Amino acid sequence: MVTAHFVLIHTICHGAWIWHKLKPALERAGHKVTALDMAASGIDPRQIEQINSFDEYSEPLLTFLEKLPQGEKVIIVGESCAGLNIAIAADRYVDKIAAGVFHNSLLPDTVHSPSYTVEKLLESFPDWRDTEYFTFTNITGETITTMKLGFVLLRENLFTKCTDGEYELAKMVMRKGSLFQNVLAQRPKFTEKGYGSIKKVYIWTDQDKIFLPDFQRWQIANYKPDKVYQVQGGDHKLQLTKTEEVAHILQEVADAYA
């Protein structure tokens, strides 16, 4: 079996803690694993009101790739909204990325605005239940909407089949976050030369209660990945509810692309 260096990227409002089950599962198989907190996430000391864009939010990933030794490549695994982090990183450091893995994730394309899949997600799932919304003005004068994910949303739509302990952990450590949708809408498209050229693997389940099946099928049809894996059962957090299945898939990704 081939071993690889996996870099695990959480979604907005979360942190590296979301990978606490998958990281050791991959390490037991001999892989190197780095789980990063994005800006104003997890234990990163910044507040979301200090972050001006999704690119700035991605800074820890970009800094990590910048420092990666020349010739070394990683497989980036992004959950949920972290597909955007993968795209941003691939446009800057395409030579350092062996593949991008989209885990029940946004799958942006290179044809439309970077906000396109966000807009489609919000059309598919417009009511974020008991989520609270706030606004602030960023450095360029844009009004940024932030959110604190509601506990009902977390339990019924994200951590649907997770244990009570995993749900309680999420409630305790969840932070405010943002999709930076209006800033993404003005951002240049992702490039064919960068993001468009990396290998893309899509992992999903039709039991996801926020990235609904029709939305995920639409994404796959819109920007066809190199490989698609459909996991049976689970929920939005496959890394928690189907840990071994995801680890097995990632081994196949390593065998193919590392």
UniProtKB/Swiss-Prot annotation:
Keywords: Lyase. Its EC number is 4.1.2.47. 2-hydroxy-2-methylpropanenitrile binds at T11, S80. Belongs to the AB hydrolase superfamily. Hydroxynitrile lyase family. This enzyme can be used as a biocatalyst for stereoselective synthesis of a wide array of (S)-cyanohydrins by addition of HCN to aldehydes or ketones. Optically active cyanohydrins are interesting intermediates for the synthesis of alpha-hydroxy acids, alpha-hydroxy ketones, or beta-ethanolamines, all of which are important building blocks in organic synthesis. Homotetramer. Exact pH optimum pH is difficult to determine due to the fact that acetone cyanohydrin is very unstable above pH 6.5 but HNL activity was found to rise from pH 3.5 to pH 5.4. The pH of the cell sap of damages cassava leaves was found to be 5.3. Residues 5-242 form the AB hydrolase-1 domain. It comes from the Eukaryota. One of its GO terms (molecular function) is aliphatic (S)-hydroxynitrile lyase activity. It is an enzyme of class 4 (lyase). This is (S)-hydroxynitrile lyase. Changing W128A: Slightly reduced affinity and catalytic activity toward acetone cyanohydrin but increased efficiency on mandelonitrile. Acquired ability to use 4-hydroxymandelonitrile as substrate. Involved in cyanogenesis, the release of HCN from cyanogenic glycosides in injured tissues; the release of toxic HCN is believed to play a central role in the defense mechanism of plants against herbivores and microbial attack. Decomposes a variety of cyanohydrins (alpha-hydroxynitriles) into HCN and the corresponding aldehydes or ketones; two natural substrates are 2-hydroxy-2-methylpropanenitrile (acetone cyanohydrin) and 2-hydroxy-2-methylbutanenitrile (2-butanone cyanohydrin), but in vitro can also act on 2-hydroxy-2-methylpentanenitrile (2-pentanone cyanohydrin) and mandelonitrile. The gene is HNL. The record marks D208 as: Increases basicity of active site His. The active site is at S80 (proton donor/acceptor), H236 (proton donor/acceptor). InterPro entries: AB_hydrolase_1, AB_hydrolase_fold, MES/HNL. It catalyses: a monosubstituted aliphatic (S)-hydroxynitrile = an aldehyde + hydrogen cyanide; a disubstituted aliphatic (S)-hydroxynitrile = a ketone + hydrogen cyanide; an aromatic (S)-hydroxynitrile = an aromatic aldehyde + hydrogen cyanide; 2-hydroxy-2-methylpropanenitrile = acetone + hydrogen cyanide. The keyword Lyase applies. Acetone binds at T11, S80, C81.
